[in-house]
């Protein structure tokens, strides 16, 4: 179960991602399991609409902007670059919080 704090963050994350070249995003890790602490970061697995046009500066800027919006450290992991050894754990924990063109995400 997502904590009230994480539930309150999701609409802000969704609004931000809608302005960026992100196709879909999943919350994973301690926040998706309801086990976060005040020191926990927010782990996001994202798929970009056109990843070959995003520079490291673009991605770094997205991280900084998200951190300002939600007041927490953010780890932004590209789905295509997720290492195979981590895939099973991430897939087990992940909760879809954004998909381009969808107006309601459960």
Task: Describe each PLM feature range.
Residues 40-42:
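Short, conserved active-site loops that position catalytic residues or coordinate cofactors/metal ions
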Residues 1-26, 32-38, 49-106:
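Catalytic core of pol beta-like nucleotidyltransferases
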